[in-house]
Protein backbone atom coordinates (compact mmCIF):
# COMPACT_ATOMS: atom_id res chain seq x y z
CA UNK A 1 0.00 0.00 0.00
CA UNK A 2 1.44 3.37 -1.07
CA UNK A 3 1.48 6.28 1.31
CA UNK A 4 -0.70 9.25 0.38
CA UNK A 5 2.11 11.54 1.56
CA UNK A 6 4.18 10.71 -1.52
CA UNK A 7 1.57 12.35 -3.73
CA UNK A 8 1.62 15.56 -1.68
CA UNK A 9 5.31 16.30 -2.32
CA UNK A 10 4.89 17.42 -5.96
CA UNK A 11 1.81 19.44 -5.00
CA UNK A 12 3.70 21.25 -2.24
CA UNK A 13 6.65 21.98 -4.52
CA UNK A 14 4.30 23.37 -7.16
CA UNK A 15 2.52 25.53 -4.57
CA UNK A 16 5.84 27.02 -3.43
CA UNK A 17 6.87 27.79 -7.00
CA UNK A 18 3.49 29.32 -7.76
CA UNK A 19 3.83 31.84 -4.94
CA UNK A 20 7.23 32.92 -6.33
CA UNK A 21 8.47 33.45 -2.77
CA UNK A 22 11.53 31.36 -3.53
CA UNK A 23 12.25 33.44 -6.64
CA UNK A 24 13.60 36.50 -4.81
CA UNK A 25 16.50 38.74 -5.77
CA UNK A 26 20.00 38.50 -4.35
CA UNK A 27 20.31 41.37 -1.83
CA UNK A 28 24.07 41.61 -2.39
CA UNK A 29 23.49 42.07 -6.12
CA UNK A 30 20.89 44.75 -5.43
CA UNK A 31 23.20 46.71 -3.13
CA UNK A 32 26.05 46.47 -5.65
CA UNK A 33 23.79 47.73 -8.41
CA UNK A 34 22.36 50.62 -6.37
CA UNK A 35 25.89 51.70 -5.41
CA UNK A 36 27.73 51.30 -8.72
CA UNK A 37 24.91 51.08 -11.32
CA UNK A 38 26.81 48.05 -12.64
CA UNK A 39 25.78 44.46 -12.03
CA UNK A 40 26.35 42.15 -14.98
CA UNK A 41 24.67 38.73 -14.86
CA UNK A 42 22.99 39.55 -11.55
CA UNK A 43 19.99 37.87 -9.99
CA UNK A 44 17.46 40.67 -9.46
CA UNK A 45 14.19 38.79 -9.86
CA UNK A 46 11.29 40.86 -8.49
CA UNK A 47 13.62 43.73 -7.48
CA UNK A 48 11.87 47.01 -6.69
CA UNK A 49 13.64 49.68 -8.74
CA UNK A 50 10.79 52.10 -9.43
CA UNK A 51 11.30 55.86 -9.73
CA UNK A 52 15.09 55.51 -9.76
CA UNK A 53 17.75 57.47 -11.67
CA UNK A 54 19.62 54.65 -13.46
CA UNK A 55 21.03 56.45 -16.50
CA UNK A 56 23.93 54.62 -18.12
CA UNK A 57 23.61 51.62 -15.81
CA UNK A 58 24.86 48.18 -16.87
CA UNK A 59 22.72 45.11 -16.17
CA UNK A 60 23.89 43.04 -19.14
CA UNK A 61 22.84 39.40 -18.87
CA UNK A 62 20.97 39.88 -15.60
CA UNK A 63 17.79 38.12 -14.51
CA UNK A 64 15.24 40.90 -13.97
CA UNK A 65 12.14 38.72 -14.20
CA UNK A 66 9.19 40.60 -12.66
CA UNK A 67 11.40 43.52 -11.65
CA UNK A 68 9.63 46.84 -11.11
CA UNK A 69 11.15 49.77 -13.03
CA UNK A 70 7.98 51.91 -12.98
CA UNK A 71 8.84 55.54 -13.85
CA UNK A 72 12.60 54.89 -13.66
CA UNK A 73 15.14 56.60 -15.91
CA UNK A 74 17.24 54.02 -17.75
CA UNK A 75 18.52 56.38 -20.44
CA UNK A 76 21.47 54.76 -22.21
CA UNK A 77 21.36 51.67 -19.96
CA UNK A 78 22.84 48.35 -21.10
CA UNK A 79 20.05 45.78 -20.72
CA UNK A 80 21.31 43.46 -23.45
CA UNK A 81 20.67 39.73 -23.02
CA UNK A 82 18.58 40.37 -19.88
CA UNK A 83 15.48 38.51 -18.76
CA UNK A 84 12.88 41.26 -18.31
CA UNK A 85 9.93 38.89 -18.63
CA UNK A 86 6.81 40.17 -16.84
CA UNK A 87 8.68 43.25 -15.63
CA UNK A 88 6.87 46.53 -14.97
CA UNK A 89 8.41 49.23 -17.14
CA UNK A 90 5.39 51.52 -17.44
CA UNK A 91 6.34 55.17 -17.96
CA UNK A 92 10.05 54.20 -17.96
CA UNK A 93 12.59 56.24 -19.91
CA UNK A 94 14.66 53.83 -22.01
CA UNK A 95 15.98 56.41 -24.49
CA UNK A 96 19.06 55.02 -26.22
CA UNK A 97 19.02 51.89 -24.04
CA UNK A 98 20.57 48.67 -25.35
CA UNK A 99 17.92 45.93 -25.16
CA UNK A 100 19.60 43.76 -27.80
CA UNK A 101 18.58 40.12 -27.27
CA UNK A 102 16.54 40.94 -24.14
CA UNK A 103 13.56 38.77 -23.20
CA UNK A 104 10.63 41.16 -22.73
CA UNK A 105 7.96 38.44 -22.83
CA UNK A 106 4.78 39.72 -21.15
CA UNK A 107 6.58 42.85 -19.91
CA UNK A 108 4.55 46.02 -19.41
CA UNK A 109 6.09 48.84 -21.45
CA UNK A 110 2.95 50.96 -21.72
CA UNK A 111 3.76 54.63 -22.27
CA UNK A 112 7.50 53.95 -21.99
CA UNK A 113 9.97 56.07 -23.97
CA UNK A 114 12.21 53.95 -26.23
CA UNK A 115 13.44 56.69 -28.58
CA UNK A 116 16.58 55.35 -30.32
CA UNK A 117 16.67 52.21 -28.11
CA UNK A 118 18.14 49.04 -29.64
CA UNK A 119 15.68 46.12 -29.62
CA UNK A 120 17.52 43.96 -32.15
CA UNK A 121 16.73 40.30 -31.48
CA UNK A 122 14.58 41.07 -28.43
CA UNK A 123 11.66 38.78 -27.58
CA UNK A 124 8.41 40.75 -27.42
CA UNK A 125 5.80 38.02 -27.05
CA UNK A 126 2.66 39.45 -25.39
CA UNK A 127 4.59 42.62 -24.46
CA UNK A 128 2.32 45.59 -23.71
CA UNK A 129 3.37 48.49 -25.94
CA UNK A 130 0.28 50.74 -25.81
CA UNK A 131 1.43 54.35 -26.00
CA UNK A 132 5.11 53.38 -26.15
CA UNK A 133 7.28 55.84 -28.09
CA UNK A 134 9.38 53.82 -30.56
CA UNK A 135 10.51 56.59 -32.93
CA UNK A 136 14.12 56.00 -33.98
CA UNK A 137 14.33 52.68 -32.14
CA UNK A 138 16.11 49.78 -33.81
CA UNK A 139 13.35 47.16 -34.03
CA UNK A 140 13.77 43.42 -33.39
CA UNK A 141 14.56 42.84 -37.09
CA UNK A 142 17.23 45.58 -37.20
CA UNK A 143 15.03 48.13 -39.02
CA UNK A 144 14.63 51.70 -37.70
CA UNK A 145 11.16 52.69 -36.46
CA UNK A 146 9.96 55.80 -38.31
CA UNK A 147 8.21 58.95 -37.07
CA UNK A 148 4.75 58.13 -35.74
CA UNK A 149 5.86 54.83 -34.17
CA UNK A 150 3.65 54.87 -31.11
CA UNK A 151 2.71 51.48 -29.67
CA UNK A 152 4.06 49.76 -32.77
CA UNK A 153 7.08 50.10 -35.02
CA UNK A 154 6.38 51.71 -38.38
CA UNK A 155 9.17 50.70 -40.76
Predicted regions and their residues:
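Tandem repeat scaffolds
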Residues: 25-155
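Bacterial N-terminal signal peptides that target proteins for export
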Residues: 1-9
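Cleavable N-terminal signal peptides
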Residues: 11-12, 22-23
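A Zn2+-metalloprotease active-site environment signal
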Residues: 16
Amino acid sequence: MTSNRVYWIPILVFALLATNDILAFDKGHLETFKKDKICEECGLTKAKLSKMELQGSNLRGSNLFRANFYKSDLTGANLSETNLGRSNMKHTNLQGANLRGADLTRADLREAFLFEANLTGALLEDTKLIGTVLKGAVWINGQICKDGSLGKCIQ
